[in-house]
Amino acid sequence: MAKTSRKVTMALAVSAALLTARAATAADTPERATIVLHVDDFANLLGTDLNAAEAVASRIFAAAGIRTVWVHGRDKGPRIGGALHVKVLVLSREMAEQKISADGVGPAVLGQAAKVCGRAYIFSHRIDALAQKSQRYVGDLLGRVLAHEVGHLLLPENSHSASGIMAAAIDLRPSSVVAFTQQQTAAIRQAIASAN
C-alpha cells in the first residue's frame, strides 16, 4: 500500500511539474503575429489557382513568422485576438482597367495597395497575361503579388527593395529570393502589434 501511495504521489508530482512547465512556456511564448485577409474575388478565378496563390503568399508570410488566415466573400471569418485585418480585392478585367485608367497606373504594375483604407487591389488579367508570356503558373505569380501588395499595406511608404518579395518588379528567375528582408519582417511584425 505504501509503495502504491508513493507511486501515485510521484505521478502527481510529475504531472504537476509538467503542467506548470507547459503553462509557463505558453505564457512566455509571444502570440504569433496574424493577418486575416478578407478576399473578394471579382475575377472569378479558378478555385485551384486562388488556393495555390493563397498557399504561396502564406508560405512567404510564414517564413517571416506571420500567420495568415484567408476569409472569402462575406464570411466574417474567425475571431482572432491580436490579428490585423486587411481587404484583398482581386479585380475583374473591367474593374482593373477602370482603376488603372483612373489612377494612371503603368503597364507593368500587377497590383496596388491603398494603405489608408487597408485594401490591396490585384490586377488578375495582367498577372494571367504575365503567366502565359513567361510560362509560369498563374497561382505562383498571383501569390507573389498578393504577398507584395499586402506587404505594402504593412510597411512604410516607398517600401520597395532591391530584391526579394518587395522588389519593384517581379523577379521571374528560378533562383530569385521570394521573401521579406529581416528589416521588412521586423517592420511588418511591429505594424501588426501596433494595430492592436
List each language-model region with its residue ranges.
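Metzincin-family zinc-dependent endopeptidase catalytic domain
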Residues: 47-153
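Catalytic Zn2+-binding segment of zinc metalloproteases
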Residues: 149-165
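Post-HExxH zinc-binding segment in Zn-dependent metallohydrolases
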Residues: 159, 165-196
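N-terminal secretory signal peptides that target proteins for export/translocation
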Residues: 1-5
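Acidic/histidine-rich, surface-exposed loop or edge segments in extracytoplasmic proteins
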Residues: 30-45, 125-131
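Bacterial N-terminal signal peptides
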Residues: 9-21
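Boundary at the C-terminal end of the N-terminal hydrophobic targeting segment
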Residues: 21-28
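Solvent-exposed coil/turn segments that connect beta secondary-structure elements
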Residues: 40-42, 89-95, 125-127, 158, ...
